[in-house]
Amino acid sequence: MRKTSLLNSNISSVISKMGHTDMLAIGDCGLPIPKETERIDLALIKGVPGFIETLKAILEELQVEEVLIAKETEKVSPELFIEIKEIIKDTKITFISHEELKKELKYCKAVVRTGEQTPYANIILKSGVVF
């Protein structure tokens, strides 16, 4: 059994194959996922699992150098935005429109779908290097 906290084999597999600047998205339950992008669907019921707990678990495994967030997030869901900033600390944030974020999903290695129902609870994580 794995010693690290992330137990989902699909997420672990995607992360282990990622290289520098590859992208992985985490989305709320309403985020449209392109057909060509791998969908890792964790959504069980409304709110489960949550976006923040999923983000925290993935960040324990993935080295991230930059995040892409919809610029609408800060205004529409300010509490979520503050929590994201606290979690990612000094990681570079690039703000793009929600429409641009949805277009970027086709370039992601996968999208992890949560049960989250907070508006704009979506993020793209750009992989960094550990050396």
From Swiss-Prot:
State if Membrane is listed as a keyword: no
Q: What pathway does the UniProt record associate with this protein?
A: Carbohydrate metabolism; D-ribose degradation; D-ribose 5-phosphate from beta-D-ribopyranose: step 1/2
Predominant subcellular localization, coarse grouping: cytoplasm
Annotated substrate binding sites: D28, H98, Y120, A121, N122
Q: Provide the E.C. number(s) assigned to this enzyme.
A: 5.4.99.62
What does the UniProt record say this protein does? Catalyzes the interconversion of beta-pyran and beta-furan forms of D-ribose.
List, from the UniProt record, the residues annotated as the active site of this protein.
Answer: H20
Stated name of the protein: D-ribose pyranase
Recorded catalytic reaction(s): these are: beta-D-ribopyranose = beta-D-ribofuranose
**Keywords of this entry:** Carbohydrate metabolism, Cytoplasm, Isomerase
Assembly information from the UniProt record = Homodecamer.
The record ties this protein, via InterPro entries, to: D-ribose_pyranase, RbsD-like_sf, RbsD_FucU
A Pfam match is RbsD_FucU
The record's comment on protein family reads: Belongs to the RbsD / FucU family. RbsD subfamily.
Compartment(s) of residence: Cytoplasm
**One MF annotation (Gene Ontology) recorded for this entry:** monosaccharide binding
UniProt GO BP = D-ribose catabolic process
**PANTHER family with a match to the protein in the record:** D-RIBOSE PYRANASE (PTHR37831:SF1)
| Domain of life according to the entry | Bacteria
Is Cytoplasm tagged as a keyword?
A: yes
